[in-house]
Amino acid sequence: KVRMFHNIYIKNNFFFKKKTYSMNGEDIYIEKTFKKKAGFYVDVGAYHPLELNNTYLLYKKKWNGINIDISSLSIDYFNFLRPDDININVGVSNKNRVKTLYYQKNKSPLNTLNFKQAKKIFSKKFKKKKIKTKTLTNIIDNTKYNGKKIDFLNIDAEGNDFEVLKSLNLNKYKPKLICIELVDHFNPNKKTVKRHKIYKYLIKRNYKLVWSGHFSHMFRR
C-alpha cells in the first residue's frame, strides 16, 4: 500500500502536473473567486486526494481543511498524500444515526447512502452494510475548526447531497461558496435547476447560483 501511495504522489507531483484537478474545471473558478493565500475548506464525499478533486489546487496553495469520505481506503490515501488536512472516515446524514451503505467496491466515487441512487447506478449488483453517520455540524464541531467560518464547502454525496447540506448549521459556519451536485440532472437547463430542492433551499438562505457544470453547481453568498 505504501508503494502504491508513493507512486501516485510521484506521478502527480513530478510527471503530470496539471492546471486543474476537478472534473469540469471547478477548482479554477474556485481559486479565482477567493484570490487568497490561505483558507478553510470542507469536502464531503472527497473520494481521492488528487484526482477529480475540487480542493487539491487549494491545498497546493496552502489552504487546509476537512476531507470526509465513507471509504476507509480513500481516507488512507488522504492521510498519506494530504497530511496537513483533517481526514475523516464517516458517513454524513441529517441525524447522528446508523444507515445502510450501498457499494460495489470499497473505494469508489459511486458508493452511496441513498437506496434509489444505488438502484439507478448499480442496478441490483451491489453490497450493503450498516455504518454510523453524523451530521456535518457535529463532525466539524469536534475538530480544531469548531466555529470557524467555511470559505469553500464541497458536497459530492451521490444522491445524499441535500441531506448532507441540511445537516450543516449555515448560521454557524456560513460557507462563502458551496459546490454541490444535482445528481439527478445531467447538464440541466436553468429552469430545471431552479425547480430543484437544493436550489430553492440555498436561494432562501441568501445564496446565488454563480456557476454550473455537468453535475456540479456553485452557490455564493
Task: Annotate each language-model stretch with its function.
Residues 1-221:
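Phosphate/nucleotide-binding beta-alpha loop and adjacent structural elements of enzyme active sites
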